[in-house]
Amino acid sequence: LEAQGACAADTVLVGFWCDKGACTPSVAALLSALHGKRVFLFGTCGFGADQSYYQQIIDRVTSNLAGDAELAGWAMCQGKMGPAVKQRYEAMLEQDPDNVRFKMLLDNWVAAKDHPTKEDLDNMAAAAKKAVLGE
């Protein structure tokens, strides 16, 4: 993370991947250093396109912003998960083949494997332009 460059700008776009329902500690540290900045957040999350879940994530991530920073806007989309996650889900399902939740987790991993897509990225770019430039 290049915090010095970010701190020199008036508006900062910060990208992150969802880590246990929030952002990584390094992103949290960057956000806490962005005093007086307008901040646009964009991120990926392994679990589906649920706007209410995305809002919960953004609320948790935003709680790391410096007190005098302004959230200019945000965008989230589904993101891929690593192969170790798939292996864990497969092992869980092997132990309990009738478990609907485990099946849903594995199905979601498959659905997420090609994300973010070009459409996801285009939507994020459009949201950033609208929030930052008013376009």
Question: What is each model feature region?
Answer:
Residues 1-5:
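A short, well-structured beta->alpha microelement
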Residues 9-14, 19-135:
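FMN-binding flavodoxin-like domain, especially the glycine-rich phosphate-binding loop
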